[in-house]
């Protein structure tokens, strides 16, 4: 029973850590894309290195590692900077 509980906790921790991006990935620059004529523009969210938080990016048509459909998704995938739950704000250094 104890071994089963340990295994469940271990796999839960691994799944949680694999479900989000590394801080380096979240701090990737957001690519500037040129949209094709008639392309559907949308608002996406990305982690902004200057403000240390997820922010909206209006008029995007591209995709990238640091682009998310919702702010909640951005915060969940990039829990760094002002979104950190550890009690300290990352200074952005790697």
UniProtKB/Swiss-Prot annotation:
Q: What is its main location?
A: secreted
S-S bonds: 26-78, 35-61, 54-74
Keyword check for Glycoprotein: yes
Please indicate which superkingdom the organism of origin belongs to: Eukaryota
The record's keywords, sorted A to Z, are: Disulfide bond, Glycoprotein, Immunity, Protease inhibitor, Secreted, Serine protease inhibitor, Signal
Residues annotated as domain BPTI/Kunitz inhibitor: 26-78
GO biological process, alphabetically ordered: envenomation resulting in negative regulation of voltage-gated potassium channel activity in another organism; immune system process
Q: What induces it?
A: (Microbial infection) Induced in salivary gland, gut and ovary during infection with Bartonella henselae. Infection with Bartonella birtlesii or Escherichia coli does not affect expression.
Q: Where in the cell is it found?
A: Secreted
Q: In which tissues is it expressed?
A: Female saliva (at protein level). Female salivary gland (at protein level). Highly expressed in female salivary gland. Expressed in female gut, synganglion, ovary and carcass.
Q: Which residues form the signal peptide?
A: 1-19
- Output the InterPro entries linked to this UniProt entry: Kunitz_BPTI, Kunitz_BPTI_sf
* Role played: Serine protease inhibitor that modulates blood feeding of ticks on vertebrate species. Moderately inhibits porcine elastase. Slightly inhibits bovine chymotrypsin. Represses proliferation of murine CD4+ T-lymphocytes in response to mitogenic stimulus. Reduces secretion of several murine pro-inflammatory cytokines, such as CXCL10, CCL7, CCL4, CCL5, IL1B, IL13, IL18, IL6, IL9, IL5, TNF, IFNG, CCL11 and CSF2. Up-regulates murine IL2 secretion. Does not inhibit bovine trypsin, human thrombin and porcine kallikrein. (Microbial infection) Promotes Bartonella henselae infection in ticks.
Protein known as:
Kunitz-type serine protease inhibitor IrSPI
Q: Which gene encodes it?
A: SPI
